[in-house]
Amino acid sequence: MRIISQDGTVDVPYENVIIRVEGRTIEAYMGATYALMGVYQSTDDAIAVLREIVTYSREKYATYHMPQSNEVKNGRVQRL
């Protein structure tokens, strides 16, 4: 699975997040949450993005586009 960041580049570190998170509760893997908190406004927003990444990986989508920071509010991803 490829994950494409907001500027269109492929973010390799997020692929490691997919592997480590799959099959576990997302909240338990805080390393991924902290990495995403550098992009999004709150822990809830970071967890919302992480949930979406895991859902995409389980459903075997080939590519996941990271949402813009203004598309994640109150712990929900809302694509504009």
What is each residue range found by the language model?
Residues 1-80:
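Eukaryotic intrinsically disordered, low-complexity regulatory linkers and tails enriched in Ser/Thr/Pro
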